[in-house]
Regions:
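Eukaryotic scaffold repeat domains enriched in small/polar residues
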Residues: 1-243
Length: 243
């Protein structure tokens, strides 16, 4: 809502607030200096950032921690919530985070195969199930928004060609009820409209969806020792054709 960019760098262990012109406004974290693994201290390979309507900042810290950090608009740590586990408010690779106009926080708890919903104080409220390794999230601004969820496919040799598990996109309402799914019926693929690893999502004012994929990284998990093509798509635009 403040028209700035929040860049979450898991390799550098930082979050940077940047203007559209590229000016650095502030940075959270020390570059190249991660916190201790699973210490719940910021950051150890942070994964994503969400901005609430009150401009408080929420950062998912999921590759080397299992928690979410809440910051003031000027980057001061307010609180941290979450721990490893599979119960309410616990995480197994917290991978993405979004906020809606009412201030609810939606967290992609990837390896627990769910989205967890929290209030702005970090209190657990609900969870959305029947998902498969939810990885990317996008929620447009406005009342009663939908949520677009990018789901990874199976990551094991024994089930990587299973059908109806993804990789895919799921579009749900703000209660987690499924509206539709795109892709994933026949497992991974690299043709237009198929997915290898939906990792980052966005949408424009016309309802077109943009899907960033970590295709090269994911190829061995999806196709094993098959020869990797020289070119794999890493960004797709899905055009909305129905109002």
């Amino acid at each position: 809502p403040d028209d700035n960019l929040y860049c979450t760098d898991d390799g550098d262990h930082t979050v940077k607030k940047i203007t559209p012109e590229g000016k650095l406004l502030f940075q959270i974290g020390v570059p190249g200096n991660p916190s201790e693994f699973m210490s719940n201290l910021p950051f150890h390979r942070c994964t994503h950032t969400a901005l609430c309507p009150d401009n408080n900042i929420f950062v998912s810290d999921g590759y080397g921690n299992a928690c979410v950090h809440k910051y003031s608009p000027d980057g001061k740590l307010i609180k941290t919530f979450g721990e490893p586990g599979s119960g309410p408010g616990q995480f197994n690779l917290v991978h993405n985070i979004v906020a809606d106009d009412d201030g609810w926080i939606y967290v992609a708890d990837r390896e627990n195969h769910r989205i967890q919903v929290f209030n702005t104080e970090g209190k657990y409220e609900a969870q959305w199930n029947n998902l498969h390794r939810p990885c990317g999230l996008f929620m447009p601004r406005g009342k009663c928004p939908v949520c677009i969820i990018g789901e990874l496919g199976p990551g094991m040799l024994v089930n990587r060609q299973y059908k109806n598990l993804g990789p895919r996109l799921s579009i749900v309402d703000n209660k987690g009820e499924l509206i539709t799914r795109l892709g994933g019926e026949d497992g991974p693929g690299h043709r237009p409209g198929q997915f290898l690893a939906p990792h980052g999502l966005s949408a424009d004012s016309l309802g077109n969806i943009y899907v960033g994929e970590v295709s090269y990284t994911n190829w061995p998990a999806s196709f094993g020792d098959d020869v990797k093509p020289k070119f794999l798509k890493t960004l797709q635009k899905l055009e909305r054709i129905i109002n």
